[in-house]
Amino acid sequence: MKALLFAAALTASTASMAEELRIFNWLEYIPDEVIQQFEEEYDAKVIYDTYDAAEKMETQMLTGASGYDLVFPGSSNLGRLIDSGALEKVDTSKLTNIGNIEPEFMQILRDIGDKDNQYAVPYLWGTNIIGYNQARVKAATGKDALTSWDDIFSVESMKALEQCGVAMMDSPTEIMPLILFHLGLDPYSTKAADYKKAEEFMAELRPYIRYFNSSQFVEDLANGEICAVIGWSGSLFIAQSIAKGTNNGNDIRMVMPEEGTMVWFDNMAIPKGAPHKELAEKFINFILRPEVIAIASNSIGYANPNSKATPLVNKEIKSNPAMYIPEEDMKKLFAQESLSLRTEKIRTRAWTNIKTNR
């Protein structure tokens, strides 16, 4: 009996000694299978906290002493976090799998603020595109497909689509650049006048938009509650998968508008003063394994920048031109960028005015 009690106590003690890795990330953005595999292999315990807006993560990082070991900043705020000193340099000498990342993605990181590739490692990437219910859109508009930003950003189209429901993500970071792009303006303009033009343009469309929400649209599109949405490519893939999986009769399609769109990147980074920096670097290197990042792509529905992982990604994902963009369409993409805090305030104010139609 004493031996059994001693063994039980030893097991409990060993479990309690497992090193903790505190991650701050989007909800369900790392598959449980991946986390469990890492915990078992490295005798670690992952604490996974979530946020529902990139702005919340950024605010948390800028306050300092967050207590987190790993965060996932996007291309919209990575530059500001680096400039503010909120991130630690990653010891790339410990990332034996870093060579799996396609060079063009490392170049994009340099272009958006990580000039020497010292602070961030690419995780997943995607685009902001149009998702729609083919039958309901045809019934409302007479069109077989939505192919252009004109199919969303025009009063005529929105009036027709209002009857079946149009939604947009609730994020100035994700939608405002698309509005400016459609208007022929710099998607990352620093001019207050350009954001005023966007406000005035959207004032005509606002009455026909059912809601702004960055998560509700997935279920609603899948179930036929709405018929069109501007959303993240991976979220639209999930909506499509739900509709197919439940066999509910909704033919959900996703398309990159013919004019082009914004491409974004979520990255792995280590907060300043992270308690377990070395374990965070082990996790980053673990994610860079082709077989691991492929699990993430197959589960979450987003493309990854790991060239060796592509053969392991499900065919329905890697053959989808709205997710793994064909080379000839890549030139139509513009990368998501950071804005100065001053311009970010202007953009956010304009977005609030659009939503409230003031």
Language model features with spans:
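N-terminal signal peptide c-region/cleavage motif recognized by signal peptidases
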Residues: 13-16
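Early extracytoplasmic/lumenal segment of secretory-pathway proteins
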Residues: 19-81
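A ligand-binding cleft/hinge motif common to bilobed small-molecule-binding domains
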Residues: 77-80, 228-249
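Extracytoplasmic ligand-binding site segments that recognize negatively charged/polar headgroups
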Residues: 78, 82-208, 220-222
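A bilobed periplasmic-binding-protein/Venus flytrap-type ligand-binding module shared by bacterial periplasmic
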Residues: 131-136, 181-184, 264-276, 295
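Periplasmic-binding protein-like
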Residues: 195-204, 210, 248-269
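Conserved C-terminal helix/tail region of periplasmic/extracytoplasmic solute-binding proteins
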Residues: 219, 327-358
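Mature extracytoplasmic/periplasmic domains
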Residues: 271-332
